[in-house]
């Protein structure tokens, strides 16, 4: 069994998602939410403040495509909390998280599993392989979405970038999973839809790689992965992983 541990990206690999964070309706709704809690934001003012605070927390971090620099990750709930405090409301973290979840629900146009996603994970676990999630994601959004999609119990471990302060392609994020789970790199494979973050990032720490070009993959040349799928086909991914 070559691939004893299978590491997956989430969005664009197992789950298809579309969010719209620029719609006037979203920011009008969120301004109403803040006003109900005593924070009198106007929609355009709120959006501008949100973007400013995100930028401040990111601290000018390099873009996801630059694999030569570290890639810090923020905790988005801090932004929602700061938006209350800028209007004089001493909001606790529980309210900030609930506000963040409302933002995510309102900005998500759809989220759904790709065909065969759950079946793939179940088959790998039934075969005795380790199944792990390593995703650039905000924990307050993604843990709720994993529960809604029924994926949480299908992983042996879930690693979300906002919990660790760094994100793919930063080698530290991959190494955290390998170290904490005592996984030798030569026994593991990374499956993802992003050539820079998933594939080249994984290769820097010695992982095998499977690339899937999905509907939300970055527009980039096909990467030099061990296996390259030019279209979404999780049944083919299952065959690759189970046969190795």
Can you name each region flagged by the protein language model?
Residues 1-6, 16-20, 35-44, 94, ...:
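Asp-based, Mg2+/Mn2+-dependent phosphohydrolase catalytic module
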């Amino acid at each position: 069994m070559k691939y004893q541990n299978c590491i997956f990206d989430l969005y664009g690999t197992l789950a298809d998602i579309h969010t719209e964070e620029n719609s006037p309706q979203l920011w009008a709704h969120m301004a109403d939410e803040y006003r109900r809690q005593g924070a009198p934001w106007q929609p355009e003012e709120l959006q501008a403040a949100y973007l400013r605070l995100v930028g401040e927390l990111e601290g000018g971090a390099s873009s996801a495509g630059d694999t030569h620099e570290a890639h810090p990750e923020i905790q988005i709930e801090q932004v929602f909390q700061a938006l209350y405090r800028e209007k004089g409301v001493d909001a606790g973290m529980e309210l900030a998280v609930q506000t963040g979840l409302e933002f995510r629900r309102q900005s998500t146009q759809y989220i759904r599993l790709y065909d065969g996603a759950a079946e793939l994970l179940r088959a790998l676990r039934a075969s005795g392989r380790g199944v792990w999630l390593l995703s650039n994601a905000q924990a307050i959004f993604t843990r709720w979405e994993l529960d809604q999609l029924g994926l949480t119990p299908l992983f042996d471990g879930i690693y979300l970038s906002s919990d660790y302060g760094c994100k793919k392609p930063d080698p530290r994020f991959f190494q955290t999973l390998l170290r904490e789970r005592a996984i030798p790199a030569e026994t593991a494979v990374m499956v993802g839809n992003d050539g820079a973050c998933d594939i080249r990032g994984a290769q820097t720490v010695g992982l095998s790689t499977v690339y899937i070009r999905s509907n939300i993959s970055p527009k980039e040349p096909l990467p030099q992965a061990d296996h390259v799928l030019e279209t979404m086909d999780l049944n083919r991914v299952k065959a690759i992983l189970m046969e190795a």
